[in-house]
Amino acid sequence: MKNSFIGIIGLGYVGLPLATAFASKYQVIGFDINQKRITELNKGLDLTNELTTEQLNKVIGSSLKLTTVLDDLSECTVYIVTVPTPVTSSKSPDLTPVIKATESVSKVLKKGDTVVYESTVYPGVTEEVCVPIHIRLYLLF
């Protein structure tokens, strides 16, 4: 892991603190689809109030790079998916964010890379939903 990059997908309540924690020891690329969020974070502003400006400025630009560009993740060998799992009006989990994040990671995944799901999902989602997406999309690229 010494020369490896860690990719954190989703920079919300879970992903951002995780990215900064890893950035204290490793090179981290934080990815989010929300350009406004990335712009704010690069200015040292975390509107979720999970981190202070000092905490952000300590790692951003040195060991933590923030981006909305998927190809920037291609240097990573470890990916940690931290996207939300909202609940529908019928109280069922909406796996759309997890599926979209899985599809994105699959486009930059290389043989030997590791993917970890930190999102709250029911048992079996990784094996039944995410792994088949990785296999299908990985074989296409």
Regions found by a protein language model. Give the residues of each.
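Aromatic pocket-lining residues of Rossmann-like dinucleotide-binding sites
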Residues: 22
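N-terminal Rossmann-fold NAD(P) dinucleotide-binding loop
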Residues: 15-16
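Rossmann-like NAD(P)(H) cofactor-binding subdomain of soluble oxidoreductases
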Residues: 87-141
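Glycine-rich Rossmann-fold phosphate-binding loop(s) that bind the pyrophosphate
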Residues: 11
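Conserved N-terminal Rossmann-fold NAD(P) cofactor-binding segment
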Residues: 2-5, 27, 33-78, 84-92, ...
